[in-house]
Amino acid sequence: MRIKNGAAGGKRLIKAAVIIRDPDQQYEGLRTCIGLLLENIEVQMFVLHHEIVAMDDAYRDNMAFVDEMKGERYSNHSGNVEDYGFRHVTLSELARKINTADVIIPF
């Protein structure tokens, strides 16, 4: 696991929040999540304000890989929650979750 030094000399995992707001960047955001997970970085993927538009077999397989690697997938769009297995997140919940991230990557 990827660990960094904490403020008091303790160790903790590195956590990244990948925020995908641009529908044209959905695949790049997902690929970034996979790359981070392969480096043993905790990942929270957020797809905001739109439904996945590029859902094909490759995207579906990559989402399954994110799930296998214990990545977390969230969306505030009901279509993603109902059709693609994302967990629902409100904007206030999003704010709390990304506040715990060491790195925030926007798309």
Regions found by a protein language model. Give the residues of each.
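Histidine-anchored nucleotide/phosphate-binding helix
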Residues: 25-41, 45
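Glycine-rich, highly charged phosphate/nucleotide-binding loops
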Residues: 84-93
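An anion/phosphate-binding loop that grips the pyrophosphate of nucleotide cofactors and donors
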Residues: 101
